[in-house]
Each structure stands twice: as structure tokens, then as C-alpha cells.
A protein has these predicted regions:
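Short, function-defining helix-loop hinge/capping sites that tune catalysis or transport
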Residues: 115, 215-216
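N-terminal signal-anchor module of multipass membrane proteins
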Residues: 201, 213-214
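Long, contiguous internal "core" modules enriched in hydrophobic/ aromatic residues
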Residues: 9-206
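Membrane-proximal cytoplasmic C-terminal regulatory module of class A 7TM GPCRs
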Residues: 216-225
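Membrane helical hairpin/interfacial module
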Residues: 1-9
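Surface-exposed loop/turn and secondary-structure junction residues enriched for glycine/proline
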Residues: 51, 214-215
Length: 225
């Protein structure tokens, strides 16, 4: 619903900018579209944050991460448009730098949290046999992989996850922020912003993949995971 409400002012802003330029009415409609865009991102984040069986999503870090990633990627696209349209990144480059560093800090805090968070349940507590000591399954519920294991029980080695996290930090946040800063200072803005945008797209793709790959549903306890 939030996304549907956002479309009219967003399209209106684009039309006004094209026809009238950056006048008062255009600015007001643009601010409304931006505010509704943030509301849409927040609603999307809460879809995941409200899923209690998945501890990697059901926490206080999910929504702020979504908001900061949206601000960062939006600032990057704004800088790209300005650089390609006017030949200068200007203050948008500095905005990318600030938003990128904030998003990187939030992402690090999120990873630290899910790495140190205690499991929501154990096989013993899930089966109600906690008072009898250690519990282990005698047999798997299924002989072949099913939807739960395929979508919510993906196993990624810790060393591989750590490597992908480092790649994410470098390509999604640090390098683009540095390139945007240089572009904002007037150093071949268009070329640097295009490169920064491509790096951001690649880094955020890996970040989104990790967000889903590292999530585990409590139902996987019954499969010995």
C-alpha cells in the first residue's frame, strides 16, 4: 500500500521537474515523494523484522539498516544524475560519503549482533524435552531437501561469509564513498560517480544475498541445524 501511495507524487515530481524545473511546487512534491519513499522502505523492513522465527531479521538492527541503505543508494543515484546531467556531483558527493559511512557502521553493528546473539531455541526446548537433557534427532523429517531447508536453512561457511562481508564493505560502502568524495571535490565527477555506482550495485547485491543466506528459521532445528 505504501508503495502505491508513493507512485503519484514520485511521477508528479518527475513530470514537474521536466516541465517546470526546480521551482517551489516541484520541491514540495519532491519532498512528499521522498518522505513516502522512506515510509515504503520502513514498511518493507518491518515485513522482515516482524518474523519472530528468524532471529537474524527479528531484531532492532533490521529497520535502521534498511533505512540507511536506502538513503545511501538514493544519494548515490542522485549524485549519478547530477554528474551526468551537469558534469558536477557537488554536495551530493559529500552526501554519499556521509550516508555510506553511516550505512557501513550500521551494517557492521548488525553483523556483530547476529554473530553474538543467542539462539531463540534449541532442539530440546522446541520439543519440550529440555528437562531431560540433551536432545538429538534419530532421523531427519525428510529424505530429500524441502522448501524449509532450501529457503530458510541455507548453510554458508563462516570463512566464506566473512570474506563476502569484507567484499561488501569495500565495494558497497568504502570505495564508493571515497570515489564520491573525490567527485564532489571536482575530480572527473561523471567518471568517478559512474564507477562508484557500479561498485555500489555489486556490493549491495552481495549484501542482500548475505541477508537472506545467513537467515535461519527455527524450524531447521528439527533437521539438526
Amino acid at each position: 500500500m505504501a508503495s502505491l501511495v508513493t507512485f503519484p507524487p514520485a511521477l508528479g515530481f518527475a513530470a514537474l521537474w521536466w516541465v517546470m524545473g526546480p521551482g517551489p511546487v516541484t520541491v514540495i512534491v519532491g519532498l512528499i515523494a521522498a518522505a513516502l519513499g522512506l515510509v515504503t522502505v520502513y514498511c518493507t523492513a518491518m515485513i522482515y523484522a516482524s518474523l519472530k522465527p528468524i532471529r537474524q531479521w527479528n531484531n532492532k538492527h533490521t529497520a535502521p539498516n534498511y533505512m540507511l541503505l536506502a538513503l545511501f543508494s538514493g544519494a548515490m543515484l542522485l549524485a549519478l544524475l547530477l554528474a551526468c546531467w551537469t558534469g558536477q556531483a557537488g554536495l551530493a558527493g559529500l552526501l554519499v560519503l556521509v550516508a555510506g559511512l553511516l550505512a557501513a557502521a550500521a551494517k557492521l553493528a548488525y553483523w556483530r549482533f547476529i554473530d553474538t546473539q543467542k539462539p531463540l531455541a534449541t532442539l530440546a526446548s522446541a520439543t519440550g524435552l529440555k528437562e531431560y537433557g540433551a536432545v538429538r534427532p534419530l532421523d531427519a523429517p525428510h529424505f530429500t531437501e524441502n522448501y524449509v531447508l532450501r529457503e530458510m536453512g541455507y548453510q554458508i561457511a563462516r570463512k566464506h561469509a566473512a570474506k563476502l562481508r569484507r567484499i561488501t564493505l569495500a565495494t558497497a560502502f568504502l570505495l564508493p564513498a571515497l570515489l564520491a568524495l573525490l567527485a564532489g571535490l571536482g575530480l572527473v565527477p561523471a567518471l568517478l560517480i559512474i564507477l562508484a555506482t557500479l561498485l555500489t550495485a555489486m556490493g549491495l547485491f552481495i549484501e542482500r544475498w548475505l541477508f537472506f543466506a545467513e537467515a535461519t528459521h527455527v524450524a531447521t532445528l528439527y533437521y539438526g541445524r
